[in-house]
Amino acid sequence: MYEMSGIDSLFHDRVVHDYSHTSEQVIVVYISSAAGDNSWLHQWFKPGNLSDEERENILWVRLVNGTKECLLFKSIFPSSSAPSINILQNGLLECSIQGNSLSREQDPWETFINGLQSVFKGQVTKRKLFSKSNEEYQRVKRMIQNDKLERKYVFQNTNDPQRKPQKWKQLTVTDNVSYKSQKGFLAQNYCTLQLKLPNGYTISNTFPPQTKLHKVRMWLDYNCYDDGTPYLFHRNIPRVTLTRNDELKSLQELDLLPRSTLILEPLEANNKTFDYMEQSSLLHKVYSGLTSFWAKEPEVDASSSRLGYQRLGTNVSNSANYSLQKLSSLDMVSDGGGGGGGDSMTPSAYTTPRMYPSNGTSQLRQNVSELNLSSNNSASNTKVRTLGYSNNNGNN
């Protein structure tokens, strides 16, 4: 009799509207076969074993089979039948105990309690996660409020005329390596130029910082460039074209240290700007006199005719095997000798890509003063530069 009164007092025939706001609340729906028929539930259900928390936190609903509410419930959950008891949470069916599907070995009450525990565990986990997220939210909110108060305090003190100005000690960041000293050391020792030729080749070489730019032009003309087209040096960063007056300056004066890239810009034969610059510049006349003296072709030495050197841009008629290789040692064009004076050429340990016969002699001199230029070969219509070198017999 106690159990009957407990079941009748536990389940509600209609859902109270006050419970509609509890979307996450656990709902237990009991579907009876007929009105007032609780015989199936009395066989196993033990309302006295429920705790007060389960009684208060769970919404207990009873539906009669065939009623409008029961038909609506079955349309949402077609698997439910009469008699049955169903556990819902968040609109999902978590556990269902059907009266006709239970076996004798299966205890309905144990199944019901296990279903409630699994649902409550999920609720506890969600509550913990929600509490943690809420704590984090509150912490961030407090930090924002404190930051606002701090900025407000600083702003008020700044506008206060009676407030004494506070001197802040500026922090200086020091490093073990001084950039200026390192830059000065690199600038005093070498200047690496990367030269981009009009034919697509890119070569690089290292020069002393006091080398004039016209010496770089001479080194380039005698070693790499033989197109015959006049050209000027163009600097990409900053975008500037170096004139003939600039070529009388050193690499250090042109701010090309420690490394820079120069692009060769070919000029057309009828370029008026180039012709006007050549005719009107007094410095160019001096430069032309100097270059005409250096560019005079000496006579061909028979002892040096064994080493053939093909420069870039020439028309080679024969099919000689030329390969792009790196030399083990190159010379640099210099305006200062080993002692800091004179006009001698100082050897360099840096290597530069060079095009030369694959079976040629490994010894190669790059200094302009040591180059012997042969005349054009009329038989093969091939322009070949022959480099002079010192053989073992001592002949030049």
Curated annotation (Swiss-Prot):
Keywords, ordered alphabetically: Phosphoprotein, Ubl conjugation pathway
Domain of life of the source: Eukaryota
Phosphoserine: modified positions: 369
Residues in UBX domain copies: 186-264
Database matches in CDD domains: UBX
Keyword Glycosyltransferase: no
Matching Pfam families: UBX, UBX7_N
Gene Ontology annotations for the cellular component aspect, listed alphabetically: endoplasmic reticulum; nucleus
SUPFAM superfamilies: Ubiquitin-like (SSF54236)
SMART domains cross-referenced by the UniProt entry: UBX
GO process terms (BP): ERAD pathway; sporulation resulting in formation of a cellular spore; ubiquitin-dependent protein catabolic process
Record field: compositional bias (Polar residues): 382-396
Stored PROSITE patterns: UBX
Region (Disordered): 333-361, 374-396
Note: Present with 1340 molecules/cell in log phase SD medium.
Stated role: Involved in CDC48-dependent protein degradation through the ubiquitin/proteasome pathway.
Protein name: UBX domain-containing protein 6
Native source species: Saccharomyces cerevisiae (strain ATCC 204508 / S288c)
